């Protein structure tokens, strides 16, 4: 096993522990708490994949961080902070919409890279909007927290989320997953649009009809693989 993979996991475990202690003191905001819950699932998945105990990894990560801090000067810290782009949290959904349980009469599931796509294939002839909560850096989508598909009546009929065992994804992964979800829902004569906020940060533009500017290759994939793959 690559030593960098192990040490990265160890550092992530310790940093999660620090953030959890901070949250336990009721000092974290909603995006901070969302990341803690998401990262906890990710760490559990990585622990199983790597075969490494989380508690032992947390202790090892603490030693790595302590060594780095001992070698870090205040000036170097200022330079590193200045070079990192500031992320911000964008919310299409309310906390209630994010946390609400939902059920599928005809469940369908597909994996697109590190993202899981779920939809209810019993949904017919509905007007559907895709809404998401995500982080943004340099005015582009950075990390998808959660995407859900809502009917005009407010029912949840689809979702895109991260796989805990495969952390990390790109904006292209998100756009591909959205294309698959749209294709699956449109197969049953539903009309699907993407929120203007999500269009703007994922594609850099927004259309009034709610249809993102998918590349021709992706349009062909949406049209030709939905029935067999989703």
From Swiss-Prot:
UniProt motif (Nuclear export signal) ranges: 137-146
Which residue ranges does the record annotate as region Disordered?
A: 204-230
Chain location of the short sequence motif Nuclear localization signal per the record: 34-38
Q: What Gene Ontology cellular component terms go with this record?
A: host cell cytoplasm; host cell nucleus
Keyword terms, alphabetized? Eukaryotic host gene expression shutoff by virus, Host cytoplasm, Host gene expression shutoff by virus, Host mRNA suppression by virus, Host nucleus, Host-virus interaction, Inhibition of host innate immune response by virus, Inhibition of host interferon signaling pathway by virus, Inhibition of host PKR by virus, Inhibition of host pre-mRNA processing by virus, Inhibition of host RIG-I by virus, Inhibition of host RLR pathway by virus, Interferon antiviral system evasion, RNA-binding, Ubl conjugation, Viral immunoevasion
What residue spans carry the region label PABPN1-binding? 223-230
Where is the major localization of this protein? Answer: host cell
Question: What GO biological process, any one, is recorded here?
Answer: symbiont-mediated suppression of host PKR/eIFalpha signaling
Q: What is this protein called?
A: Non-structural protein 1
What does the entry's PTM section describe? Answer: Upon interferon induction, ISGylated via host HERC5; this results in the impairment of NS1 interaction with RNA targets due to its inability to form homodimers and to interact with host EIF2AK2/PKR.
Region RNA-binding and homodimerization, annotated ranges: 1-73
Summarize subunit and interaction data from the UniProt record for this chain: Homodimer. Interacts with host TRIM25 (via coiled coil); this interaction specifically inhibits TRIM25 multimerization and TRIM25-mediated RIGI CARD ubiquitination. Interacts with human EIF2AK2/PKR, CPSF4, IVNS1ABP and PABPN1.
Specify the species: Influenza A virus (strain A/Gull/Maryland/1824/1978 H13N6)
What gene is this protein translated from?
A: NS
Where in or outside the cell is it found?
Answer: Host nucleus; Host cytoplasm
Per the record, which residues fall in region CPSF4-binding?
Answer: 180-215
Task performed by this protein: Inhibits post-transcriptional processing of cellular pre-mRNA, by binding and inhibiting two cellular proteins that are required for the 3'-end processing of cellular pre-mRNAs: the 30 kDa cleavage and polyadenylation specificity factor/CPSF4 and the poly(A)-binding protein 2/PABPN1. In turn, unprocessed 3' end pre-mRNAs accumulate in the host nucleus and are no longer exported to the cytoplasm. Cellular protein synthesis is thereby shut off very early after virus infection.
Question: Domain comment text?
Answer: The dsRNA-binding region is required for suppression of RNA silencing.
**GO-annotated molecular function:** protein serine/threonine kinase inhibitor activity; RNA binding
In terms of InterPro entries, this protein maps to:
NS1 (IPR004208), NS1A (IPR000256), NS1A_effect_dom-like_sf (IPR038064), uS15_NS1_RNA-bd_sf (IPR009068)
HAMAP family named in the record: INFV_NS1 (MF_04066)
Family statement drawn from the similarity comment of this UniProt entry: Belongs to the influenza A viruses NS1 family.
